[in-house]
């Protein structure tokens, strides 16, 4: 069966033919390739076409597809352990590794996804503070938990919808919306309802309305307001953890969050998530405290082995981050040069190995409102051109591109050559 045949048959058994909406390429007006295999940064579809991958499973594969050390760990563990629903040494090893190597992490709880991590962190914050309301920011995406599906980023933003059917108003009545990088608005919000706020959750580097780094003074204001009103500050590092730096995005700011969520890279390509923070807060979790959260597959030994292999390799080869920064800078500078030479309005936001191309006339993209000025029709033309040229990029103006340690300068040169052909056609 070829790509089209598989996808058409998939529609008979899966809604839209996919298990996550953005994969169907609906907003791009085309069918997706059906991926068969991947190694390093090269993936191959069922038609036999190869692509240089800049999606990397939406961020987890910093080491590239099927890294030999990660695959070895998975194979060795799976020969003797798949799942027990019981304590294992591997979950201790990964938990200890993260607590000892990350800042502001005294204790950690393993879960199975980023959504589980963020929803559990919010529950814990509510249990710890005894308050109900949370603040999230328009354009930020924290998973598909009901309380987050309002003014969300990622696929919700891509499809141009305000939220989701099936989410009753009661589920979001305790969710307050902040404006990213707007100190005045967040101060007013706290002034009116600060005593009811349990937590502020934020992507310190947003990745689901495109890449936007929070302003330093904005993050400091959040920390100050949370301290003043007795709320917790939660950094959602599902995307940025171990990516923008080994210790994550919190190293970019002189700020200490109370809770941090992780996923993606920490699982080495397998389903994984975690939330972590100060001991006094984490011990409110059952069985130590009264905040209940559980999971049959949490701490799964195969996943723990993949995560431990991934993070250990990154720690022991910290220079890999310098390589990612180098090729990221080369890509960014090359794209800007080409766009200027061909009068294609373009802003590129990049933090380490994640970046977004914003097709906009603005001089900078720093807020959710800025993002909404982007030329989606031009992005669609760019996407289709690059896919035809053999590059896998996210099918949305509002998602990040990801780089890996396996990308080379040659891969970047090929991408720039293809982008130049696109830009010339846009004249």
From Swiss-Prot:
<comment type="similarity">
    <text>Belongs to the class-III pyridoxal-phosphate-dependent aminotransferase family. HemL subfamily.</text>
</comment>
<keyword id="KW-0627">Porphyrin biosynthesis</keyword>
<dbReference type="InterPro" id="IPR015422">
    <property type="entry name" value="PyrdxlP-dep_Trfase_small"/>
</dbReference>
<dbReference type="InterPro" id="IPR004639">
    <property type="entry name" value="4pyrrol_synth_GluAld_NH2Trfase"/>
</dbReference>
<dbReference type="GO" id="GO:0030170">
    <property type="term" value="F:pyridoxal phosphate binding"/>
</dbReference>
<dbReference type="InterPro" id="IPR005814">
    <property type="entry name" value="Aminotrans_3"/>
</dbReference>
<dbReference type="Pfam" id="PF00202">
    <property type="entry name" value="Aminotran_3"/>
</dbReference>
<comment type="subunit">
    <text>Homodimer.</text>
</comment>
<dbReference type="InterPro" id="IPR015424">
    <property type="entry name" value="PyrdxlP-dep_Trfase"/>
</dbReference>
<dbReference type="InterPro" id="IPR049704">
    <property type="entry name" value="Aminotrans_3_PPA_site"/>
</dbReference>
<protein>
    <recommendedName>
        <fullName>Glutamate-1-semialdehyde 2,1-aminomutase</fullName>
        <ecNumber>5.4.3.8</ecNumber>
    </recommendedName>
</protein>
<dbReference type="GO" id="GO:0008483">
    <property type="term" value="F:transaminase activity"/>
</dbReference>
<keyword id="KW-0663">Pyridoxal phosphate</keyword>
<comment type="pathway">
    <text>Porphyrin-containing compound metabolism; protoporphyrin-IX biosynthesis; 5-aminolevulinate from L-glutamyl-tRNA(Glu): step 2/2.</text>
</comment>
<keyword id="KW-0413">Isomerase</keyword>
<dbReference type="GO" id="GO:0006782">
    <property type="term" value="P:protoporphyrinogen IX biosynthetic process"/>
</dbReference>
<dbReference type="GO" id="GO:0005737">
    <property type="term" value="C:cytoplasm"/>
</dbReference>
<keyword id="KW-0963">Cytoplasm</keyword>
<feature type="modified residue" description="N6-(pyridoxal phosphate)lysine">
    <location>
        <position position="264"/>
    </location>
</feature>
<dbReference type="GO" id="GO:0042286">
    <property type="term" value="F:glutamate-1-semialdehyde 2,1-aminomutase activity"/>
</dbReference>
<dbReference type="InterPro" id="IPR015421">
    <property type="entry name" value="PyrdxlP-dep_Trfase_major"/>
</dbReference>
